[in-house]
């Protein structure tokens, strides 16, 4: 971009919510944040640090817009049959570095979905990419105590929740499972799992364009 004659670069991180990636890794990669430990870790992962004379600005993550709520509302509506009998559980990656930001975003999203659909019970859990799925299981169990049917959606860009759920269920298989013979707390629950994440959706594409354009307009 510098060689092409760009006078300014606006980097829009396609990330769900604030994390170590948005706050430290990406800025360090782009040369606008300096931390020897972060830079060492990035180099060990094969990343090449960028150093340019062109001013670089990193913008906010998706959670600062209403895009996630609007897309997940569509996912829930696709799965919903009788809102009065249903609960919704939202799963997301979460961040050990900045947990409050994720908790606020998940609470806001579930509240919005419930308000728009008439579903009266909602919960959420930060599960990484499935390594903390026991948190999801606990949320689903509790939801199933309140409602007959539990809709589970994920705030992930490229995946739904079915794959994570399948890995969890496989742990209890008699053959090849990690915990054969143990009681599966999710067995027999009436769960409806979203197969699709946030993408593909035009709202995400438009958010990228709008975010970059807004930054340029605010700071010409």
Language model features with spans:
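Extended amphipathic ligand-handling, pore-lining, and cofactor/metal-binding catalytic surfaces
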Residues: 1-220
């Amino acid at each position: 971009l510098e060689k092409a004659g760009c006078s300014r670069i606006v980097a829009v991180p396609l990330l769900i919510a604030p994390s170590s990636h948005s706050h430290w890794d990406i800025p360090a990669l782009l040369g606008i944040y300096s931390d020897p430990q972060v830079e060492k870790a990035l180099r060990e992962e094969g990343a090449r640090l960028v150093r340019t004379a062109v001013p670089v600005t990193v913008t906010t993550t998706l959670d600062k817009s209403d895009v996630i709520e609007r897309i997940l509302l569509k996912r829930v509506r696709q799965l919903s049959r009788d809102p009065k009998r249903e609960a919704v559980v939202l799963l997301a990656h979460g961040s050990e570095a900045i947990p409050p930001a994720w908790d606020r975003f998940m609470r806001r999203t579930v509240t919005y979905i419930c308000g728009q659909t008439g579903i009266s019970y909602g919960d959420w859990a930060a599960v990484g990419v499935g390594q903390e799925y026991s948190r999801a299981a606990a949320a689903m169990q509790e939801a199933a105590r309140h409602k007959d049917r539990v809709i589970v959606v994920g705030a992930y860009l490229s995946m739904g929740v079915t794959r994570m759920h399948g890995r969890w269920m496989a742990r209890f298989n008699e053959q090849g499972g990690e915990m054969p013979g143990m009681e599966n707390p999710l067995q027999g629950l009436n769960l409806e799992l979203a197969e699709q994440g946030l993408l593909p959706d035009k709202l995400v594409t438009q958010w990228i364009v709008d975010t970059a354009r807004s930054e340029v307009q605010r700071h010409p």
